[in-house]
Every structure is written in structure tokens, then in C-alpha cells.
Amino acid sequence: MNREAIFHNPVSNYAFPISYEKFKVRLRARKGDLDRVTLVIGNKYLWHTRKEVPMEVEGSDELFDYYSYVYPVDDPRVAYYFLLEKGDEQWLYGDSGFAKPELVNIDEDESSAFVNFHFPFINRIAVSYTHLRAHETD
């Protein structure tokens, strides 16, 4: 797994609300490098209710695959991390970088704060008119 090519920024076009009820998350990886990408996402204050969802390749260019998932938001306080798999190799990728999943107890408050990317609150002002208009055809 080429970890150097993996990229996500929670305050960018890699994580943003596309409507008042939908939050889009993207991950970049080396083209053809990963077998599976799972997004683990949920309410940061009700972390035990998190969901594990497979991400699909949204697009590719010469160097990278871009994975994405649109999360239906029921609470605007979102936290998430990625589980990356290639063959028998697994890595958890979060705000503090990479970790082996078996070494992290994600259910401990300290661990989830260390691991998770955070989008603190989906404010109605953060949902741009352009995003609303662009996704009316969905």
C-alpha cells in the first residue's frame, strides 16, 4: 500500500455538505492501489451509533483514484475515519495519520478523538447555493 499517496483534508473539497441533509467525503489514493476503502462515520457525540460504509471510486486521473461517499446526515456533528485494505494489509487512516486497526480501541473516548477526522457542525450557511443547485438533479 502506497501510504504516501493517500490524502484527505476535512476542511476542503474532500469533506463538505452538499445539502442540509447530505455530507460528502472523499479520499485520494494511488491509482489501482487499494482493494477496499471503508468509511466509518457517525455522530461524534454518539460514536457507538457509527456506520461502516464502502466507498466507491468516483473518478480517476493518471495518478490517483478518488473515492467518495455521500452520508445522509441526521445530526450535523460528524466524525469519521477510513479503513484501507490491500490484500492482507489493513490501515486505519484518521486525523493523526495511519494506525494499525488492532492497536486502536476506537470505542475509548481518547482513541476516537485521536483517530477521527471531525467536521464540527454543518451550518446552513456552509451549504453553498452552488452545491444546492448542482445537486438538484440527483
Name the predicted role of every residue range.
Residues H131-D138:
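Single conserved hydrophobic/aromatic residue that forms the stacking wall/gate
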Residues M1-Y129:
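Glycan-association/targeting regions that enable binding to alpha-glucans and other polysaccharides
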